[in-house]
Curated annotation (Swiss-Prot):
Taxonomic classification: Bacteria, Bacillati, Actinomycetota, Actinomycetes, Mycobacteriales
Subcellular location: Cytoplasm
InterPro entries: Ferrochelatase, Ferrochelatase_C, Ferrochelatase_N
UniProt keyword Transferase present: no
Keywords for the protein's UniProt record, in alphabetical order: Cytoplasm, Heme biosynthesis, Iron, Lyase, Metal-binding, Porphyrin biosynthesis
UniProt enzyme class: lyase
Protein name listed in UniProt: Coproporphyrin III ferrochelatase
UniProt keyword Lyase present: yes
Region: Disordered, residue numbers: 357-377
Pathway: Porphyrin-containing compound metabolism; protoheme biosynthesis
EC number: 4.99.1.9
Disulfide bonds: none
Gene3D superfamilies in alphabetical order: 3.40.50.1400
Amino acid sequence: MNARTPDTKSDSYDALLVLSFGGPEGPEEVRPFLENVTRGRGIPPERLDEVGAHYYHFGGVSPLNRLNKEIIANVKAELAARGYDIPVYFGNRNWKPFDNEAAEQMAADGIRNALVFATSAWGGYSGCRQYHEDIQGMRAHLEEIGAPEVTFTKLRQFYDHPRFVRTMAQYVRESFDKLPEDLRDEARLVFTAHSIPLNSKDADGNPIDGSIYSRQVEESSALIAREAGIDDFDVVWQSRSGSPHVPWLEPDIVDHAVELNENNGQKALVVCPVGFISDHMEVIWDLDSELMDEATRRGMVIERVATVGPSDEFATMVVDLIDEMEMKRVIERLGTLPVRGSTVNGEPCVPGCCAPRRRPAASQTNPNADAPVASRS
């Protein structure tokens, strides 16, 4: 199966695949899901138990699949409103419905030239290239079982799309309005996204525009703040794991809140999870549980900004991205950093971009060390 570039695509696509990370939908699914996520990484069982406790706290259910289904329903409605008559499929890397199963169904249904919307706004390995690898895996699976070939064209990164920025800015303003009136003027806006190891940060992008993920997060945050009419803000990180000896992007959101409170007497924060399009586990545990608990102990008030994924405006943006491909429209964007991500059949955006850093097996490092068990989605 030969990969192609977007310049050689056909003029019409016959399906859309929403490709995501996956999450358990019951207690019995938690451990198998985590084993899928960590397969081949040598993660100690006790680390899986620790992360599993986060899911069990919510009944063993991640909200991610439900929220993705909301996105799909909204996208279907927007497609119909614009006169598109194409089916929408759903597949995950790590849990049901699996991406290979979605690819099988697409091939059986006669789909031959599909678009792929990955539920990540960003560049970088976890935010972009890993989805290209998923596409390569789906095509290899179809070839292995003798199914008809399906061509997959991934839609581009959208961290600075006007609809994404405007909707997030609207949600930021609404969060400020929810604060007690006497705290609004002094409240600080803090953007947060999933941390990554510094060696992965340096590998994101190509040799010319490295660290693309962290730079896109910073630019997106600045665009949202400006649209919301806010001059001063912070960009921080969350959900780090792994050995404490491995440096990750900092500061951590909880550490930052504590520092603002202790050093500046900060009493109120508006926290915007810009790195996440939906309220999945990193949002509802790390922010709505851990951060809120620390804030309560300190007498701080925190308003957590809503995520954009379930909104009608987000679905409109997804179909805008489809329009760009179908009609060869000039892309809509507000930022200045490179925007890539759209290739055919899982080809990297440019040779060598966003290369994964090889993780040593747990037995080769600290046998009691944590290891990453989550990815941006």
